[in-house]
Amino acid sequence: MKRVLFFQVLFLFIFTTAQAQIKKSPDYETAKAEAIKEKKDILIVLTGSEWCKPCVKMKKNVFENQEFVDYANEHFVIFEVNLPRHWDMNSKVYQDYSFFKEKYQTNALPSLVLLDSNEKLKAVISEKLTLFDKTMEKLKELK
């Protein structure tokens, strides 16, 4: 009986403390289709979350903040291009990174590219992305 009660309490604890995750599209084509269907903007995240120090800080301070997660999931379709420390120039992730970097003229990591559902550029944000308040303020201002 004690064992059953223990597992019930453990199960309840796990599910009440679990935080929602940012919903990410697996590829850009899917992100575009979802944005049109859901009438949301597209947020392209250019990052190197394993090795880029500002990217690591952005992930910790912004993308792991529950307020940001909730806001982002409600307002954006997110497509992340996360460059690994050792990338191959022929890889899909590197090709995506190169394409978006050139198209939206940003060399900064991290960068956020905000598009409307028709892919019209709203903004490229590459400053103060490690600061939760500044990032939220900018995204809400552009919404």
Regions found by a protein language model. Give the residues of each.
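Short active-site neighborhood of thiol/selenol oxidoreductases, capturing the structured segment around
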Residues: 38-52
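Thiol-based oxidoreductase modules, predominantly thioredoxin-like and allied folds used
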Residues: 23-25, 68-94
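The canonical Cys-X-X-Cys-His
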Residues: 52-55, 112
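Hydrophobic beta-strand anchors of alpha/beta hydrolase catalytic cores
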Residues: 43-44, 78, 112
